[in-house]
Amino acid sequence: MNQSSRGRDAAKPSEIPARGWKEILWRVYGEISEDRVMLIAAGVTYYLLLAMVPGLSALISIYGLFFDPASIQDHTQMLSGIVPGGGMEILEEQMERLASGGRTTLGLTFAISLAIALWSANAGMKSLFEAMNVAYEENETRGFAKLTATSLAFTLSGIVGIICMIGVVVVVPGVLNLIGLGSATEWLIRIGSYVLLFVIASLAIAALFRWGPDRANAKWQWITPGTILSVFVILAVSALFSWYVANFGSYNETYGSLGALIGFLTWIWLAVTILIVGGELNSEMELQTARDTTTPPESAMGSRGATVADTVAGTPEAGDMAASPDTSARRGTRPRLSAGNLAFAVPAALLLAFLERRSRQR
């Protein structure tokens, strides 16, 4: 078999031909079941739910240093089209309760409260790191201090990013009025808010893919496809799910007073599932090439510090984890059919058809 037709010498994802992408997507399809992506996402959802209130507490504490805490609800309405209605009710209720204490003042009490909130919210971030280890076929070997420092940095960066986004929404209207664009303010703010949300989400997910798993850092080009897939699909699925809950959802009829919470949990679970699948895509892309996909200096295979960078799919060393469609069939380990597989298979088939058509046109 011509190895170049499969992308074995690809230095970046765009150099992988259609045949190579077919193998990548087939393996991702199988890994959804093999890595129990939906079960892992459910576990992460649990930890994120536990981290939600401490995270909001830390957010409002820092937000209160610059703005009136009671105004935070007015500035988070941009999420109403993405977070399901029940989820927004839960978030708004918690924000109202936490903001009732008034404006934050610097002091020992504030520092202790913020530290406790960040530490509690940090458990949710660590669960995302573990999900990335699953996607990239890694085992966690970082010591307690290094892992905690990294996850705390992510947690604090996420909170600061949200505050910056809210700050833009607060400051921009005044600037637009000063330059004579007052009548277009509302429209510009709405468009700008969603663009800013997309940019921040992209940066956050790319950072998670790069520094979340316990491995040598991947080059940015080997992170980008999974990031783009995750952001677009999460935003699209979130909007569709919010619309479904608003128009057809019957969570309250089925679960009563727990309906809003169940809908919120389902939304988080869907988002985390998509995020892990994005990591699986990046992982399988690295398995497709024999070139070093980690940051410089270049290293020989076997000494790159990352399982998927040190392995090529379809080789004996790769094992069942990285088996190509041909070797999977011979070993009797073809991916099992499941709802998660089907949810991935339809868009994957459309993408394959597009890639093959583009290949023929060339």
Question: Predicted segment positions?
Answer:
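Membrane-embedded alpha-helices and immediately adjacent juxtamembrane helical segments
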Residues: 1-362
